[in-house]
Regions:
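Non-catalytic, soluble scaffold/interaction modules
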Residues: 1-225
């Protein structure tokens, strides 16, 4: 029997089979484009679509976790409205004559790194928010849906990390618990898990491998294992 230590974000015990959730990686390549203004328009259309999607997530979250906790999605909308963020993407498109996906990815890396290097723990967590909104924009540019956890039976989700948008879309009758390799007890994902009453561990000292899928496991949020 293997025992892994993590940080509990919500006490409780869950027993069930593991479901390894691995996000489909967004393959972003740098491509030269000719019509920069058309590419800027592509970005803005994708950004506006992301705004609408976040509005829908906010409405769902209000019902699930209340207005105060749903405010994370309003904050995500504000990040997408941020002029520095938009200017960065548009400037990269115009000056380098590259595709919007690449410009968004570069902007995401820049801003998320900037937040991650801050001393304040709350501000550090905003790095994950920048990555989340950027992934949503890139998914829209590619004509894809942003990843979400889908399962047919009650399971313990095992993931590298979960974004707030993925967490709020979890079906509580299908998720016994979740365990992530990364993440923090101060993250919005952790806050949502507590509010939704889902036993969860984050920053767990283990390696995420596909062969764990289907294994029987016990999550004890009281003793952090």
């Amino acid at each position: 029997m293997n025992v892994y230590q993590g940080k509990s974000v919500f006490g409780g015990i869950a027993i069930g089979h593991l479901c390894v959730y691995q996000k489909g990686e967004q393959q972003v390549t740098r491509q030269k484009i000719e019509d920069v203004e058309a590419e800027v328009k592509r970005f803005q259309v994708a950004r506006e679509a992301a705004q609408a999607q976040l509005g829908e997530l906010y409405d769902k979250a209000v019902k699930e976790v209340g207005e105060a906790n749903a405010a994370i999605f309003e904050m995500h909308q504000m990040l997408l409205e941020d002029e520095d963020y938009q200017d960065s993407v548009e400037n990269i498109i115009r000056t380098q004559q590259v595709n919007a996906e690449y410009a968004t990815a570069v902007t995401s890396d820049h801003f998320s790194s900037m937040f991650a290097e801050m001393d304040d723990d709350y501000m550090k967590e905003r790095a994950a928010d920048i990555r989340d909104i950027s992934e949503r924009v890139i998914a829209n540019l590619n004509g894809e849906n942003k990843s979400k956890v889908v399962t047919d039976e009650p399971v313990i989700i095992l993931a590298d990390d979960l974004a707030p948008s993925e967490t709020v879309q979890l079906e509580k009758d299908k998720v016994l618990s979740f365990v992530t390799v990364h993440g923090s007890v101060n993250s919005h994902t952790a806050i949502l898990a507590r509010t939704m009453g889902i036993p969860a561990l984050v920053s767990t000292e283990m390696e995420l491998t596909q062969d764990l899928d289907g294994k029987l496991a016990v999550v004890d949020g009281i003793i952090h294992v």
